[in-house]
Swiss-Prot record:
The gene is dinB. PANTHER family: DNA POLYMERASE KAPPA, DNA REPAIR POLYMERASE UMUC / TRANSFERASE FAMILY MEMBER. It comes from Clostridium perfringens (strain 13 / Type A). It is an enzyme of class 2 (transferase). InterPro entries: DNA/RNA_pol_sf, DNA_pol_Y-fam_lit_finger_sf, DNA_pol_Y-fam_little_finger, DNA_polymerase-Y, DNApol_IV, Rev_trsase/Diguanyl_cyclase, UmuC. Its EC number is 2.7.7.7. This is DNA polymerase IV. The active site is at 107. Its cofactor is Mg(2+). The record marks 16 as: Substrate discrimination.
Length: 359
């Protein structure tokens, strides 16, 4: 563990939906869903907190969301707007440190260990950042402050929306002991069920197992959870982390024009992409569909979720949404492809049922 490290995790609250409510006062206080049309096999990219009260969450089929809340307002994502707002937020963060690691459009780690701002207080810096984001961008953010990345991330999730949580070396052990195992960074349904089966429900339950035992049960994840349970995370905030993507495309033997036939091919492609993600211990937030026509022109359509995914079923829900907005103009298709980008750090990668940064 590094001495005197001061790490802040900034996490924008319901980012896409909050931007839409900011820009359109008629949406404020209403259940708003950013994503696909419920009548066209779309998926939810994100939703407002008003919509979440109905059990709606990211990657849920839009039709399911509609059934849960028929009065919800559905709108298409405006990715260029979200990217512009993200740059505004990141510019603010960069004023406080030159060690900023964006994880996606709406969250980032900031290492303020050597910062002289706010008399060197990470807590005061986090509060000032939150205040500036609200005044200058018109949005709320949640902040976590701690001495490593794992605890800073857990802290930002603790009091959403518009909250701040500080985890010190003195209170970290108590915080981790009480933390439900499903809240641990990277622990999804599969690992959660495995741990529940051996009597692990909270952080304190992990302390009863040796590193060797956890590795035997969970593989490499076991070593990481062993360290997390003891408040250990030596990863550095990395402003130069390279963004990569994982994808697969197929050139068809014969040009096709039937949508159902395309869906069948995309099902196979998504299986391959999901397999690659699993093999590389990766998952991502952005799903991109590529379509090349028989005149060799091509188009891409993308959707960025507010949680990470790697499972084939979730990927295909997004792909079906994307293909529904492609204008084929009566042209035949000669190539189809799927790419997953905005990849998560290679720590513990597994599907999460809920949003990875919106609680």
């Amino acid at each position: 563990m590094k001495e005197n490290r001061k790490i802040i995790h900034i996490d924008m609250d319901a980012f896409y939906a909050s931007i839409e409510q900011r820009d359109n006062p008629k949406y404020k206080g209403k259940p708003l869903i950013v994503g696909g049309d419920p009548n066209r096999r779309g998926v939810v990219a994100t939703c407002s907190y008003e919509a979440r009260k109905y059990g709606i969450h990211s990657a849920m089929p839009s039709l399911t969301a509609y059934k849960l809340c028929p009065k919800a307002i559905f709108i298409r994502p405006r990715m260029e707007v979200y990217k512009k707002v993200s740059r505004q937020v990141m510019n603010i963060l960069n004023e406080y440190s030159n060690i900023v690691e964006p994880l996606s459009l709406d969250e980032a780690f900031v290492d303020v260990s050597k910062s002289k701002r706010c008399k060197g207080s990470a807590t005061l810096i986090a509060l000032e950042i939150k205040e500036r984001i609200f005044k200058e961008v018109g949005l709320t953010a949640s902040a976590g402050v701690s001495f490593n990345k794992f605890l800073a991330k857990m802290a930002s999730d603790f009091r959403k929306p518009d909250g701040i949580t500080v985890i010190t070396e003195e209170n970290s052990k108590d915080f981790i002991r009480k933390l439900p195992i499903g809240k641990f960074f990277g622990v999804g349904r599969v690992t959660k069920n495995k741990l529940n089966n051996i009597g692990v429900f909270k952080g304190e339950d992990l302390l009863g197992f040796s590193e060797k035992e956890l590795i035997g049960i969970l593989g490499d994840r076991g070593k990481i959870l062993y360290e997390f349970a003891r408040g250990i995370d030596n990863r550095q905030v990395n402003p130069y982390r390279i963004r990569k993507s994982i994808g697969k495309e197929i050139t068809l033997r014969e040009d096709i024009e039937d949508i159902e036939e395309m869906i069948e091919i995309l099902e196979k492609i998504s299986e391959r992409v999901s397999e690659s993600l699993c093999l590389l211990n990766k998952k991502g937030k952005t799903v991109t569909l590529k379509v090349k026509f028989n005149d060799f022109k091509h188009i891409t359509r993308s959707i960025t979720l507010e949680h990470f995914l790697k499972e084939q079923k979730e990927i295909m829900e997004c792909v079906k949404d994307l293909i529904s907005i492609v204008d084929f103009k009566n042209k035949k298709v000669r190539l189809l492809g799927i790419t997953i980008s905005s990849l998560e750090e290679n720590i513990i990668t597994e599907e999460r049922e809920q949003l990875s940064f919106d609680v």
